[in-house]
């Protein structure tokens, strides 16, 4: 059996920009993408803690170390600058892999810089 499991998440990131006129996606600081093992164009789910919105999109790299979290395209209607979000990536795993897999959880501070928890 195959299972759809959480691979990683960036927890409580703060939206730094929203660009309605971009084609789509979420721009994420390249450093955070690497820490969370999220590749460019990988599908991610975004959960907005402020308003309860949830949506799927794909990740694109932002400038390394910038703290950028920018919601692009139509999804910009679902988030505002300053909103707190969770960005989740998933992977398909067989039962044995899923039982032993430990997802990467990246906590960030108010500037979207990684912190140890």
Curated annotation (Swiss-Prot):
Molecular-function GO term, any one: aspartate 1-decarboxylase activity
Subunit comment: Heterooctamer of four alpha and four beta subunits.
GO cellular component, one term: cytosol
Pathway per the UniProt entry: Cofactor biosynthesis; (R)-pantothenate biosynthesis; beta-alanine from L-aspartate: step 1/1
Top-level EC class as recorded in UniProt: lyase
Keywords: Autocatalytic cleavage, Cytoplasm, Decarboxylase, Lyase, Pantothenate biosynthesis, Pyruvate, Schiff base, Zymogen
Compartments where found: Cytoplasm
EC annotation from Swiss-Prot or TrEMBL: 4.1.1.11
Name this protein carries in UniProt: Aspartate 1-decarboxylase
PTM description: Is synthesized initially as an inactive proenzyme, which is activated by self-cleavage at a specific serine bond to produce a beta-subunit with a hydroxyl group at its C-terminus and an alpha-subunit with a pyruvoyl group at its N-terminus.
Reactions that this protein is recorded to catalyse: L-aspartate + H(+) = beta-alanine + CO2
Lineage, opening ranks: Bacteria, Bacillati, Bacillota, Clostridia, Thermoanaerobacterales
Biological processes per GO annotation: alanine biosynthetic process; pantothenate biosynthetic process
Function (record text): Catalyzes the pyruvoyl-dependent decarboxylation of aspartate to produce beta-alanine.
CDD domains: Asp_decarbox (cd06919)
């Amino acid at each position: 059996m195959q299972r759809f499991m959480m691979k990683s998440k960036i927890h409580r990131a703060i939206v730094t920009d929203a660009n309605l006129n971009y084609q789509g996606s979420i721009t994420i600081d390249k450093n955070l993408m690497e820490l969370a093992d999220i590749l460019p164009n990988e599908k991610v789910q975004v959960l907005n803690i402020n308003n309860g919105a949830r949506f799927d999109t794909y990740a694109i790299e932002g400038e390394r170390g910038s703290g950028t979290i920018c919601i692009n395209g139509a999804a910009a209607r679902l988030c505002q600058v300053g909103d707190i979000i969770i960005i989740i990536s998933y992977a398909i795993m067989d039962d044995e892999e899923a039982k032993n897999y430990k997802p990467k959880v990246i906590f960030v501070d108010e500037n979207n810089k990684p912190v140890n928890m």
